[in-house]
C-alpha cells in the first residue's frame, strides 16, 4: 500500500485540519506501507514543491511525487525534491510527449507511474516503456470530484496485466475495497483521503495493511 499526503481536495475540502503533514507522513511510515505519495499541485490540491522536500527528508521510504507533470523541468524539481518516482497522467499527455519525460525521469533514477482512467487511455500507453501502471478510480480531469469506487479497477485491470506492477488509486478506504482491488489484479493500492479523514489514522492504516498480499 502507498499512503498519501494531500493538503486538500475539491471534493472533501481541507484534509490536514491543522495537522503537520510531515508529522503525518512520519506516522504513516511507522506502518508496513510501501511508500508515501505527496501531492504538490497548488491550485486544486493545495500542495507545493516544498512539501515534497520536507516529507522526503523526514521518512526512509520511497516517495511518489504527484502533480500535473508535463515538462522536463518538473522532473528535475522532482529529483531535487527527493522523490523516488513521479506520476504521469495519460489524460493530460500524448504518448509522443510522454516518451521524453520517461527518458528524462530515468536519467534522474526516477521511476514512472503512468496513470489511466479509461480503456482508451490504457491502450494509449501500453506500448510505452515505463515502470508502474496506475488505474485512477476517479476522473482527474474533473479533479476527482466524481463519486466512484474500485469498480474502475475491476473493469480495467485485465487489460493491464503483464510486465508492470498495477496500482489501484483513489476511492479506496476499507479492507473490503483493498481486497476487491487485489482480486481484480492490482498489485498495490494508493490511499489518501480515507486515511487523512479517519478519526484515528493508526487504526485505518492497521486495517488496510492487515489485508496482506496477494489477496
Segments (PLM) and residue ranges:
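Conserved N-terminal beta1-alpha1 strand-loop-helix module at the mouth
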Residues: 1-63, 70-73, 104, 109-132, ...
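Extended, folded domain segments that form the structural surfaces/walls around functional sites
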Residues: 52-54, 85, 179
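Active-site-proximal loop->helix
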Residues: 76-81, 100-104
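Glycine-rich phosphate-binding active-site loops on the catalytic face of alpha/beta enzymes
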Residues: 80-97, 134-144, 184-205
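Glycine-rich anion-binding loop/nest that anchors nucleotide
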Residues: 167-170, 190
Amino acid at each position: 500500500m502507498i499512503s498519501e499526503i494531500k493538503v486538500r481536495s475539491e471534493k472533501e475540502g481541507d484534509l490536514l485540519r491543522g495537522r503537520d503533514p510531515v508529522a503525518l507522513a512520519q506516522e504513516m511510515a511507522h506502518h508496513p506501507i510501501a511508500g508515501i505519495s505527496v501531492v504538490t499541485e497548488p491550485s486544486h490540491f493545495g500542495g507545493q514543491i516544498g512539501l515534497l522536500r520536507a516529507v522526503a527528508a523526514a521518512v526512509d521510504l520511497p516517495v511518489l511525487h504527484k502533480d500535473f507533470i508535463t515538462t522536463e523541468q518538473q522532473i528535475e524539481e522532482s529529483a531535487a525534491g527527493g522523490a523516488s518516482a513521479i506520476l504521469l497522467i495519460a489524460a493530460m499527455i500524448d504518448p509522443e510527449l510522454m516518451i521524453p519525460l520517461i527518458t528524462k525521469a530515468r536519467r534522474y533514477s526516477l521511476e514512472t507511474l503512468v496513470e489511466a482512467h479509461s480503456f482508451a487511455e490504457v491502450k494509449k500507453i501500453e506500448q510505452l516503456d515505463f515502470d508502474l501502471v496506475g488505474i485512477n478510480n476517479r476522473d482527474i480531469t474533473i479533479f476527482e470530484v466524481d463519486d466512484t469506487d474500485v469498480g474502475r479497477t475491476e473493469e480495467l485491470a485485465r487489460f493491464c496485466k503483464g510486465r508492470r506492477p498495477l496500482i489501484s488509486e483513489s476511492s479506496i478506504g476499507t479492507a473490503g475495497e483493498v481486497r476487491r482491488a487485489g482480486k481484480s489484479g492490482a498489485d498495490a493500492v494508493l490511499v489518501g483521503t480515507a486515511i487523512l479523514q479517519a478519526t484515528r489514522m493508526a487504526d485505518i492504516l492497521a486495517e488496510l495493511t492487515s489485508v496482506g498480499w496477494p489477496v
